[in-house]
């Protein structure tokens, strides 16, 4: 394979990040196909006149996010295909079509987008300057492998107040996105153990578990959350759940189901990975405590991120380890360099400490509550009895079950012809996927575009 990235040494972006982005972009564009072998670290380092460490860090990040896998005595192979990730951008068949698609003005209901127009850039800039003034040359030192102590302390305090999470700063590990933290977590456990995984569930997490030789045990999800009886029948060593806003269906795990899951984990000395996906955004009913906050036996690993509530590009996530896993977790983490810069961490710490974070999250909750109301009203008005809405009580997207004579793929293609991007749901399933359900993320779409986009769906589907 010919690798010809242009690595710009004059940029502030590290070379390994530039190399990582090159591979990621070319996989998304289809230029690097699933199964293709990547150059060895030594060969690529020599070819690009960079260190093997630079190549290794780029490959590690790609592997952590599920883009490549290492095969013993064979090397690194591309493991990415758009269909592997349920809501990734759908590829064009040619570079010309790809370029035309990128230049087109879409109404894009991607679930991962946020409304950046409300980001408090002036307050963030002030926090950046304050952190520079306060820490100065300390910012040039290598970051603590667990993350900066001040930020870890503030995260522990915030999680206790907002989600009832009980932890100290020594239990907090910071990383550049949940995939990297999951990669670290997988190495805390022995290979070939079994992990109960929500079906449907988060595809990227599944790929990371598989890449780390874990045995995936699909567990169905109903209106109350993951099915405990199926867990008891399968007896996995671990269970991965998204209880605040089930990744695909959008359901909120009931308090009764949470207690049952915790009881099972305690009785079987098993661990639960609680991915608090979209936990900040709930629109109806009383907030349900986190599993970690309810846990009395140290069986829950808690994961969260600032990506949805701040900006995805900031890439700051965190993982809370229970005390039985601390020693091994710290040992594994020490093998990696910290993936979030000191400056970014200390800027966020200033942002939280000065009260800007709480003001911002309150503002975004109000904004997204309004957008949710707009999308629900527009769907009911324009699409009416031809659809059923699901997952609307929390999070930043909804599902539509469509009662029309079109399958999922055709529904998406018809929408694209009218300038609207909606996304499939079926690829999140391992068994019995729905054939006529699509996902609409509303956070990153303007209020006027939400209304216009739903009107265009009505026209596209000839309702």
Swiss-Prot record:
Swiss-Prot/TrEMBL cofactor(s): pyridoxal 5'-phosphate
Keywords: Aminotransferase, DNA-binding, Pyridoxal phosphate, Transcription, Transcription regulation, Transferase
InterPro entries according to UniProt: Aminotransferase_I/II_large, HTH_trans_reg/aminotransferase, PyrdxlP-dep_Trfase, PyrdxlP-dep_Trfase_major, Tscrpt_reg_HTH_GntR, WH-like_DNA-bd_sf, WH_DNA-bd_sf
UniProt GO BP: biosynthetic process
Transmembrane segments: none
Keyword Transferase: yes
Domain of life per record: Bacteria
N6-(pyridoxal phosphate)lysine modifications at: 308
DNA-binding listed as a keyword: yes
Example GO molecular function: pyridoxal phosphate binding
UniProt xrefs under Pfam families: Aminotran_1_2, GntR
Assigned protein family: In the C-terminal section; belongs to the class-I pyridoxal-phosphate-dependent aminotransferase family.
UniProt protein name: Uncharacterized HTH-type transcriptional regulator YdeL
Native source organism of the sequence: Bacillus subtilis (strain 168)
Species classification: Bacteria, Bacillati, Bacillota, Bacilli, Bacillales
Gene: ydeL
């Amino acid at each position: 394979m010919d690798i010809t990235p242009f690595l710009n040494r004059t940029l502030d972006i590290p070379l390994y990040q530039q190399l990582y982005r090159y591979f990621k972009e070319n996989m998304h564009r289809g230029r690097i196909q699933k199964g293709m072998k990547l150059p060895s670290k030594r060969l690529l380092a020599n070819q690009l006149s960079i260190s093997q460490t630079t190549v290794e860090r780029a490959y590690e990040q790609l592997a952590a996010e599920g883009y490549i896998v290492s095969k013993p005595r064979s090397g690194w192979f591309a493991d990415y295909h758009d269909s592997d990730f349920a809501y990734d951008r759908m590829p064009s068949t040619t570079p010309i079509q790809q370029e035309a698609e990128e230049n087109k003005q879409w109404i894009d209901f991607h679930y991962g987008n946020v409304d950046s127009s409300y980001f408090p850039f002036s307050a963030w800039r002030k926090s950046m300057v304050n952190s520079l003034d306060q820490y100065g040359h300390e910012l040039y030192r290598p970051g603590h492998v667990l993350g900066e102590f001040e930020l870890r302390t503030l995260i522990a305090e915030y999680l206790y107040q907002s989600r009832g999470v009980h932890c100290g700063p020594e239990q907090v590990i910071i990383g550049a996105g949940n995939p990297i933290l999951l990669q670290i977590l997988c190495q805390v456990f022995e290979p070939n153990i079994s992990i109960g995984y929500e079906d449907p569930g988060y595809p990227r997490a599944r790929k990371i578990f598989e890449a780390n030789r874990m045995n995936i045990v699909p567990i169905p999800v109903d209106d109350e959350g993951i099915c405990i009886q199926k867990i008891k029948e399968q007896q996995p060593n671990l269970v991965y759940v998204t209880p605040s806003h089930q990744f695909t269906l959008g359901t909120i795990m009931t308090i009764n189901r949470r207690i049952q899951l915790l009881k099972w984990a305690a009785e079987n000395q098993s661990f639960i990975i609680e991915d608090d996906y979209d936990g900040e955004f709930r629109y109806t009913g009383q907030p349900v405590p986190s599993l970690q906050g309810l846990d009395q036996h140290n069986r829950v690993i808690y994961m969260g991120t600032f990506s949805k509530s701040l900006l995805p590009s900031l890439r700051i996530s965190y993982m809370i380890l229970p005390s039985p896993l601390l020693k091994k977790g710290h040992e594994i983490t020490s093998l990696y360099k910290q993936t979030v810069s000191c400056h970014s961490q200390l800027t966020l710490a200033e942002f939280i400490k000065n009260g800007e974070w709480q003001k911002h999250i309150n503002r975004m909750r109000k904004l997204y509550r309004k957008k949710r109301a707009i999308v629900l009203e527009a769907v009911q008005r324009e699409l009416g009895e031809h659809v059923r809405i699901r997952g609307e009580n929390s999070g930043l997207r909804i599902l539509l079950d469509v009662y029309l004579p079109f399958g999922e793929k055709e529904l998406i293609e018809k929408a694209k012809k009218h300038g609207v991007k909606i996304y499939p749901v079926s690829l999140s399933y391992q068994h019995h996927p729905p054939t006529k359900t699509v996902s609409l993320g509303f956070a990153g779409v303007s209020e006027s575009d939400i209304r216009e986009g739903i009107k265009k769906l009505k026209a596209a589907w000839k309702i």
